[in-house]
Regions:
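N-terminal glycine-rich, Lys/His-bearing helix-loop that initiates the first secondary-structure elements
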Residues: 1-103
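Short, surface-exposed helix-loop/turn micro-motifs enriched in polar/charged residues
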Residues: 75, 137-139, 160-162, 166
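Short secondary-structure junctions and interdomain/linker hinges
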Residues: 66-77, 108, 130, 134, ...
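Gly-rich Lys/Arg/Thr-decorated short loops/hinges at beta-loop-alpha junctions or inter-strand turns
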Residues: 43-44, 97-111, 129-133, 183-193, ...
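Conserved N-terminal alpha-helix of the aminotransferase class I/II PLP-enzyme fold
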Residues: 11, 16, 52-70, 99-141, ...
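Conserved phosphate/anionic-ligand binding catalytic regions in large, soluble enzymes, centered on
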Residues: 71-91, 139-147, 277-292
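Conserved PLP-enzyme active-site core in the AAT-like
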Residues: 115-118, 145-301
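Acyl-CoA thioester-binding alpha/beta core of soluble enzymes
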Residues: 31, 136, 149-152
Length: 301
């Protein structure tokens, strides 16, 4: 391990715990045994774990130093792609850690999870009401999963009509994952450029919308942080050709409770736990990507 010189400034040089190993050091002492020992066969216990010998203060200082070098929303702006990363109130994390939620095993029988099931059922109603949609599913495990679920709903809707549409309109201001979700559903993405104001124009959508197009994927507010003020006219154009309007909720926290997505022409909308609401985005979770739909798509949930 390279030694740090006596210089000023921040030195990001922290050895691994195994490199700090000092034989004989101990961070925790067990009480003296008051019964006879009974050594177990090695086939049962396995090899002795390769844990380093460290004192408690060695471990505390190690992780404290590493935590001070970490960067996140508590220490500065977090511009991760097009995602809206914001400060998360600590009280929300405390509620999420309530034992009834955090301690419930996924395989518990329904007779032992009625409280959690009731909460989830009521949450579906709350999300439908605040978004202006008609039905909600909480099944998608994260935003990208919800996005894919939304596109599969559009695919299933057209299939039920005997229509095999092959294209989907994806604006240049849409969430970057949209083309991937469209591709997984067998759609070919048709790009549309935003206008000089950074939003979609109805004319640009009308030019590419036809009866081979399943719909449009709109992020609203878009990746530039601008509300798509022409969304009603755009939705009318798409609907007139039999298409559906999908809205990516990556930036929905800006308009949640303000814009009624159902009234402005959205057919399917996905939300993000870590963007629309306030759970930290890190380490791959925890995630949730509820999908909200209008009445015509409810049978396909």
């Amino acid at each position: 391990m390279k030694e740090s010189l006596g210089t000023t400034g921040l030195v990001l040089n922290e050895p691994l715990l195994w490199e700090k190993d000092q034989k004989g050091r101990c961070g925790f002492s067990l009480p003296r045994r008051d019964v006879d020992s009974f050594p177990m066969d090695k086939d049962v216990t396995g090899d002795v774990p390769d844990f380093p010998d460290l004192s408690e203060v060695d471990v505390v200082r190690h992780y404290t130093r590493l935590s001070q070098w970490n960067f996140g929303v508590d220490t500065g702006m977090y511009p991760l792609g097009s995602c809206t990363m914001k400060y998360n109130p600590k009280t929300n994390e405390r509620q999420a850690q309530t034992p009834g939620f955090s301690g419930a095993h996924p395989m518990l029988p329904t007779n032992l999870t009625q409280g959690a099931l009731k909460l989830m059922f009521e949450l579906q109603g709350f999300l439908a009401e605040i978004t202006g949609m008609d039905a909600v599913t909480l099944q998608p495990a994260a935003g990208a999963h919800g996005e894919l679920a939304g596109m599969l709903l559009i695919w299933a809707f057209h299939k039920s009509k005997g229509s095999h549409r092959s294209k989907i309109i994806v604006p240049d201001t849409a969430h970057g994952t949209n083309p991937a979700s469209a591709s997984l559903c067998g759609f070919r993405s048709v790009p549309v450029k935003s206008n000089e104001q950074g939003i979609l124009s109805p004319e640009a959508v009308d030019e590419v919308m036809d009866e081979e197009t399943a719909g449009i994927m709109v992020t609203n507010p878009n990746t530039l942080g601008l509300f798509e003020e022409n969304i009603i006219q755009i939705a009318d154009i798409v609907h007139s050709k039999g298409g559906l309007v999908y809205c990516d909720g990556a930036n929905m926290n800006a308009v949640m409770g303000i814009a009624d997505m159902g009234k402005i022409g959205i057919d399917v909308l996905h939300l993000n736990l870590h963007k629309t609401f306030s759970t930290p985005h890190g380490g791959g979770g925890p995630g949730a990507g509820p999908v909200c739909v209008k009445k015509q798509l409810e049978p396909f949930l």
